[in-house]
Design a protein with these regions (language model features):
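4′-phosphopantetheine-dependent carrier domains
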Residues: 1-184, 189-193, 210-473, 477, ...
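Short loop/beta submotifs within extracellular cysteine-rich repeat domains
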Residues: 262, 479-484, 488
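C-terminal catalytic ATP-binding subdomain
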Residues: 196-197
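Disordered, acidic interdomain junction associated with two-component signaling
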Residues: 200-209, 223-227, 485-489
Length: 678
């Protein structure tokens, strides 16, 4: 084969084909095609609004949870929490900082004085806002993950700002411009503001094209294929190696990448279910040695012993970290202990692996992270924080010239590892958010594509862009991070989708109710609530939602309760407490509460209220008869009066008789008359 100049670029003696499954073909197409599922994060510069960017006159500084009560005395509109780590990224420091931030956020969210205010959480150097720049504060990155979950649970209340690590000024000068952008996530570098956006990851072919333009095409062909190669003579360490994802990766490395020496680490080692069968299977696939060992990867001494146990004959050349645990809970339910539990196999483990392998000749250092740390996942604050830290470690390694990539995965199919616990309600919530499950074969295709790339952070996530576009077109909210993928959806707006009046403002709902009787108002609000309940629970319609069925009996938990509260708040504009589902425990009780809030004076309309009729009569009486004649209504009015059973025929009428007849009509008659209904 030759290039465009006629120079030979390839000599081939033979070519061997092998069968490729349809799943793998689909995975390859998904990774590199126009509808691919591999993304990266780009920081897009924001225009500074001309209006509203003035310096903020006053705010209250919150350093700890105890400051919330003291700061509430003046009922300020704005509170600022500065959360700076020491830059070491030590696991203890990460836990201490995120626990402090958690305490402040929890106290602020429940403080009545701050109910209508905003909280700005400020970090410094926690985000790589200038591309693949270094992250100087990994602990601050964990704070971003935690607070993103808090934002998902409490829309429009919290803002995250990352200050320039090269600067020393506090947050004060930038509060006005940042808040004026309306962005929930922002970074300040010099005088520029930017916000994160998901963009499609560059395919390997794009890298090669750029290299060819620079006359280094031949070098790129070697570089892109070998930079991530798992050397057959080296050992690959896979943490979480007997779990669903670790097993999937181990099979893939041996079968597709030619790895011959594999070290699988898990909490139970060979005692884990299926571990011995996995060893035999990997041997059949071509592995020469497979070691399965139990190790607490959160323990530095244990990790040091593990790394030191690898033979010099087959040195450690690759690390793939898939280990992790879940302990989901809304922000208000989290504790420092629950943070620590999830941080162990994520924050501590990756920190130890990073430190203890820096002097080794690794070709791959890949960590399985989660998109929850980027997009924000309600009910997963601790998990999001841990994974955001992993992303920061990958950035630090790349900045130091070391291999490192964090893969912030979206939703795996239910049978895979950490998503196996998801029920129908959870899956329905993900689907409404435009996130689809990734099949195992497709996931491994994305894994390979991530390794071929040059980004420190990639996001393998299967997005339903058609649904996201429809949501954007309908004015429904999209997180700013994914809004850039959809035309017209770059900014997050408050709105909801669903049934029974979803998406209307509080004023629109009040206007609909104002024309109804009290009984009709309650019926409309009941259907309104039942419709939103049906959406949250994943029902096709509201038929399965009983008016007096307790929310807890219908399957509500703390997370679905928060989601329902947010949907109702977005649709009504009301300030609803996070406990509203517990305070009003069934759809009927909640509908009656909304009735009192939307129509506080109990104003109704209909036959029992004649204030509107009186106003209409006065208006009709003020109209000259010529107006009715010109509109062609006079004859109809006369005929209507002549057919009234309560009045004798009036024969010929003069103007005075006409006015009297019209004045005797009720509202229903007048409406029918105006519509031409005789």
């Amino acid at each position: 084969a030759a290039d465009e100049t006629g120079e030979p670029v390839l000599t081939m003696d033979s070519l061997v084909f092998r069968e490729v499954s349809a799943d793998r073909l689909g995975a390859a197409a998904g990774a590199g095609g126009d509808d691919g599922s591999l993304f990266r994060v780009e920081w897009a510069e924001l225009p500074v609004p001309a209006v509203g960017s003035e310096p903020v006159a006053s705010w209250v500084a919150l350093a700890g949870a105890e400051d919330v009560a003291a700061g509430a005395v003046d009922a300020p509109d704005l509170a600022v929490l500065e959360a700076y780590g020491d830059g070491t990224g030590d696991g203890d420091e990460v836990l201490a900082l995120t626990a402090r931030v958690l305490g402040v956020v929890q106290a602020w969210l429940v403080a009545p004085a701050f109910e209508n205010g905003k909280l700005v959480v400020v970090t410094r150097g926690a985000m790589p806002a200038t591309g693949d720049a270094d992250v100087t504060d990994p602990a601050g990155a964990a704070v971003w993950g935690l607070v993103r979950a808090a934002q998902a649970e409490n829309p429009d209340r919290i803002v995250l700002v990352d200050l320039d690590p090269a600067g020393s000024a506090g947050a004060g000068p930038v509060l006005g411009p940042v808040l004026a952008t309306g962005e929930p996530l922002a970074a300040v570098r010099g005088t520029a503001l930017s916000a994160p956006r998901l963009v499609r990851a560059a395919a390997v072919e794009t890298e090669r094209a750029a290299a060819a333009a620079a006359d280094v095409a031949a070098e790129s062909r070697t570089k892109t294929e070998s930079a991530y190669a798992f050397a057959p003579g080296g050992t690959v360490l896979v943490t979480g190696g007997t779990g669903s994802l670790g097993t999937l990766v181990a099979r893939h490395l041996v079968a597709e990448h030619g790895a011959r020496h594999v070290l699988l680490v898990s909490r139970r080692g060979l005692e884990a279910e299926g571990a011995r069968e996995l060893v035999a299977e990997l041997g059949e696939l071509g592995a020469e040695s497979v070691v399965v060992t139990a190790c607490d990867v959160a323990d530095r001494a244990a990790v040091a012993e593990l790394v030191g146990s690898v033979s010099a004959q087959h040195p450690l050349t690759g690390v793939v970290h898939t280990a992790g645990v879940l302990d989901d809970g809304v922000i208000g339910a989290l504790t420092p202990e629950r943070l620590a539990y999830v941080f162990g196999p994520k924050v501590a483990a990756v920190g130890h692996l990073d430190e203890l392998t820096r002097d080794m000749d690794l070709s791959v250092f890949a960590v399985f992270s989660s998109a929850s740390g980027l997009i924000g996942s309600a009910g997963q604050g601790n998990y999001a924080a841990a994974n955001a830290y992993l992303d920061a470690v990958a950035h630090r390694r790349r900045a130091a010239g070391l291999p490192g990539v964090s893969m912030a995965w979206g939703l795996w199919e239910q049978s895979a590892g950490l998503t196996a616990h998801l029920g129908a309600v959870d899956q329905a919530r993900m689907s409404r958010g435009g996130i689809l499950p990734i099949a195992p074969a497709e996931g491994m295709g994305l894994f390979d594509a991530a390794l071929r790339g040059s980004a420190a952070l990639v996001v393998p996530i299967k997005l339903d862009l058609r649904r996201l576009r429809a949501d954007a077109a309908a004015g429904r909210g999209l997180p700013g991070l994914v809004g850039g993928l959809v035309q017209g959806g770059r900014r997050q707006v408050r709105a909801v989708d669903g049934q029974a009046g979803a998406g209307e403002s509080g004023g629109g709902l009040a206007a609909r109710l104002a024309g109804l009787t009290a009984q009709e108002q309650e019926a409309l609000l009941l259907d309104f609530v039942r419709g939103h309940v049906a959406v949250v629970l994943g029902h096709a319609g509201m038929a399965k939602v009983g008016a007096e069925t307790a929310f807890k009996d219908a399957g509500f938990d703390s997370l679905t309760s928060v989601e329902l509260r947010n949907r109702l708040r977005g649709a009504t504009g009301l300030k609803l407490a996070a406990t509203v589902v517990f305070d009003y425990p069934n759809p009927l009780a909640l509908a009656r509460h909304l009735h009192r809030e939307v129509i506080p004076d109990g104003v109704t309309a209909g036959p029992d209220v004649d204030v509107d009729e009186a106003r209409l009569r006065r208006g009709l009486a003020s109209l000259p008869l010529a107006r009715f004649r010109a509109a062609g209504l006079l004859d109809a009015l006369v005929r209507l009066v002549e057919l009234d059973d309560h009045e004798p025929p009036i024969g010929t009428v003069d103007d005075a008789d006409d006015e009297t007849a019209i004045a005797d009509l009720n509202v229903d008659d007048l409406v029918q008359l105006a519509l031409g209904d005789k």
